[in-house]
């Protein structure tokens, strides 16, 4: 049996990847501007709306990872071959960017041994930059996928309804896990077990277990693509209403925690990913953006669909690059609007410039890689022709 099955392409995945990438860049642009003294109450509310609307990014990326893997691999998955491919596709692009961030952002000195130790720790933990934690987290899912896929094939229900029942049970367990996050952290700190202690304490935010439900939801969508789509369409009004209600509630909670005197201080700490309230909202967010993506595929102009699909195709390397680009695009935005200019306008400008710049860098790197590959092929062919002529 083939370990990877050729199936019809899930067209909305390209749109979803592009949307998730844009949402990540927007979140990080907001993170730079909201603490600044020039950010007023109106900016805080508007940026809060944008932040809430874009929080789907990480759970959607995890969902798409689960959906892509379980959709693509039906048969036996040879572990070493699978991991080798993931090292090539995920780790290989990650390493040079992590090195760049370690030197540029963390000022790691590689001329002494302690610098190399710091670099090694950063590579394994994703600490070289604020966005690289996701790569470390998602690679854990790749490491466990082959045995997990074999287990799921044996135990999963054969009907969509039964599978959704299991997913509902997993969601309940996930809410309990989110509720117990603090207890897990304190226990790990108290026990101080080597490796496992930091994994469940200092690095709990990049522990794949804390995101397992979104991966499971992606698996369900992969097993029953057509039923999944039909289910979302059937319940779209209920899902969209629940999403809107939760978004309004979260905005109320966030704004209620703004400090107004003696000066305005904007706070978004209520929007952390790992708590039960946000787990409910993020699940609704993934469902909502999937509904939007399906409608987008049906009704958006062709040129817009192509742009979003193009962003999706280059989203991983663009994701790796965007933090570096954002650092400089923030300066461009500040020069356009002034240091005392609208925080909202500067945020949106930095977001647009950074998303475009990171995507273009990813595109240029892929073109360069293809050109180098072609040059090597030509040289190899020429060498073979010379050998044959001798």
Pin down the residues of each PLM region.
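Aromatic-anchored segments of alpha-helical transmembrane domains
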Residues: 22-29, 167-180, 242-257, 318, ...
């Amino acid at each position: 049996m083939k370990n990877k099955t050729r199936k019809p392409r899930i067209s909305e995945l390209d749109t979803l990847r592009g949307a998730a990438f844009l949402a990540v860049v927007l979140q990080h642009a907001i993170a730079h501007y909201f603490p600044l003294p020039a950010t007023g109450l109106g900016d805080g509310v508007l940026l809060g709306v944008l932040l809430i609307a874009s929080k789907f990014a990480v759970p959607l990326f995890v969902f798409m990872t689960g959906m892509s893997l379980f959709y693509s691999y039906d048969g036996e998955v040879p572990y070493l071959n699978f991991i080798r491919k993931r090292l090539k596709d995920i780790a290989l692009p990650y390493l040079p960017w992590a090195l760049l961030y370690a030197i540029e952002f963390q000022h790691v000195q590689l001329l002494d041994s302690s610098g190399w130790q710091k670099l090694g720790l950063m590579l394994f933990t994703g600490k070289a930059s604020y966005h690289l934690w996701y790569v470390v987290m998602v690679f854990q899912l790749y490491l466990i996928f082959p045995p997990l896929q074999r287990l799921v094939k044996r135990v999963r229900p054969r009907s969509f309804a039964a599978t959704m029942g299991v997913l509902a049970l997993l969601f309940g367990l996930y809410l309990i896990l989110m509720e117990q996050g603090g207890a897990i952290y304190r226990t790990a700190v108290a026990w101080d077990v080597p490796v496992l202690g930091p994994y469940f304490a200092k690095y709990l935010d990049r522990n794949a277990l804390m995101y397992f439900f979104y991966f499971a939801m992606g698996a369900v969508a992969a097993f029953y693509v057509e039923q999944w789509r039909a289910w979302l369409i059937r319940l779209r009004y209920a899902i969209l209403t629940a999403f809107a209600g939760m978004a309004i509630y979260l905005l109320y909670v966030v704004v209620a925690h703004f400090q107004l005197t003696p000066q305005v201080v904007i706070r978004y700490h209520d929007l952390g990913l790992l708590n039960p309230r946000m787990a409910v909202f993020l699940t609704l967010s993934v469902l909502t953006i999937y509904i939007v993506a399906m409608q987008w595929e049906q009704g958006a102009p062709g040129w817009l669909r192509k742009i979003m699909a193009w962003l999706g195709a280059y989203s991983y390397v663009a994701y790796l690059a965007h933090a570096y680009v954002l650092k400089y695009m923030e300066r461009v935005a500040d020069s356009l609007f002034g240091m005392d200019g609208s925080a909202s306008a500067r945020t949106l400008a930095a977001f647009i410039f950074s998303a475009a710049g990171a995507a273009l860098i990813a595109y240029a790197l892929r073109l360069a890689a293809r050109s180098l590959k072609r040059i090597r092929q030509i040289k190899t062919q020429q060498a073979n022709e010379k050998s044959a002529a001798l």
